[in-house]
From Swiss-Prot:
GO biological process: arginine biosynthetic process via ornithine; L-arginine biosynthetic process
Matching HAMAP family: Arg_succ_lyase
Pathway(s): Amino-acid biosynthesis; L-arginine biosynthesis; L-arginine from L-ornithine and carbamoyl phosphate: step 3/3
Protein name (record): Argininosuccinate lyase
An example Gene Ontology molecular-function term: argininosuccinate lyase activity
Assigned keywords, A-Z: Amino-acid biosynthesis, Arginine biosynthesis, Cytoplasm, Lyase
Entry's localization field: Cytoplasm
Family designation: Belongs to the lyase 1 family. Argininosuccinate lyase subfamily.
Lineage summary: Bacteria, Bacillati, Bacillota, Clostridia, Peptostreptococcales
Uppermost EC category: lyase
Residue ranges of coiled coil: none
NCBIfam families membership: argH
Organism this protein belongs to: Alkaliphilus metalliredigens (strain QYMF)
Amino acid sequence: MKLWGGRFSKNTAALVDQFNASIEFDQKLYKYDIAGSVAHAKMLAHANIITKQESQLIVEGLQSILADIEAGKVEFQLELEDIHMNIETLLIDSIGEVGKKLHTARSRNDQVAVDIRLYLREEILEICELIKQLLITFTDIAEKHVDTIMPGYTHLQRAQAVTLGHHFMAYFQMFKRDHERLLDCYKRVNVMPLGAGALAGTTYATDRVFLAKELGFDAICENSLDAVSDRDFIIEFNNTASIIMMHLSRFCEELIIWNTAEFGFIEMDDAYSTGSSIMPQKKNPDLAELIRGKTGRVYGNQVNIMTMMKALPLAYNKDMQEDKIPLFDTVDNVKGCLEIFNEMIKSTTFKKENMKKATKEGFMNATDVADYLVKKGVPFRSAHEIVGKMVLHCVQTSKTIEDLTLDEFQNFSPTFTEDILEVIQIENCVASKISQGSTSPTNVLIMVNQARVFIEEVLS
């Protein structure tokens, strides 16, 4: 029998039960649903809506149900629609008529809203911890490779030499922002909707502040219509999750490229690579490719929820039942990708000699030659033109800038003196970057030390 069946003269069709039910996926919320119900039962007694004895009986019954679920003793019923009705039915079956008082001053509309918020705030903190571990890994690798020279790219064309440590600290900044965004999102997740009823509030003198304290919320939703219809916090989380996945995908794309024979910058560990069913020689970066692929899946979840919400009038609509699958999927994929990426990158071997060798081609010291002229008094645009002609000469004669003699330099400008031959050495080009945040080993080490302070003082 449906707990809402009094108004109906016949049972719903079996096909309707199957189509309407969400228990297949919202059972994931069982412990949050029970936590919300325990707090609600305590509040009902606190507000003298039910007796303390009744509240205690309900709380004990709910705790027993929680233990049974976690012991695998409960089989949820599809005909009961969702996790809320399943647990309430189990409670009534367990403690009798008193169990029917639990839903006083509550609707499934505010009940599911609090369940999702309880679930999501816990998951946000878990994702923050995974990002923290990744930031530690990035910092460790950056410190180890503070002076490992490699090509830096724009347009995927060799541009200027950088250090591998600098590259990792760039990603440190990206994921640091992700961590900050998650904590900011948490503020809007950690607001309590329970007590809003179906949409208009209740006629009972409930204490929503008591509920918020019981459940660890920072504040209550201030408008009952908004409380039950708001899914902004899910959309905001999914957007933040999409940015996290974008950052993972960007790094995975680089690793996939670096892992090719054409680049040869890295070798992925056998434990984090796969083979081919037909080509015996293959060693594929499948995990990086999967993370890149799952990024599109998370993006799709974001579009899913925004499209679902775009034309919904106030307040609750059944469409909103569909918010959970994309939310759960996003959470699971972000956590899984962060965890596997961290282990994969820790086990990766960086081929320092190949990276440095790649900086010998592509005229990656050309900007340094132009800067040299500027420091000697040549206007930058004039210096740019001089060095451009020098590069063209090198291309036409199959030379690098390092191959040029002092006489050849002076053919392009009399400003050049013998010290240019030291300036153009790639190690000196990297070391000469003295601006804050630049790629020199000295600056990268400063970044690493600042990162360690941030991890220790802010994230611990």
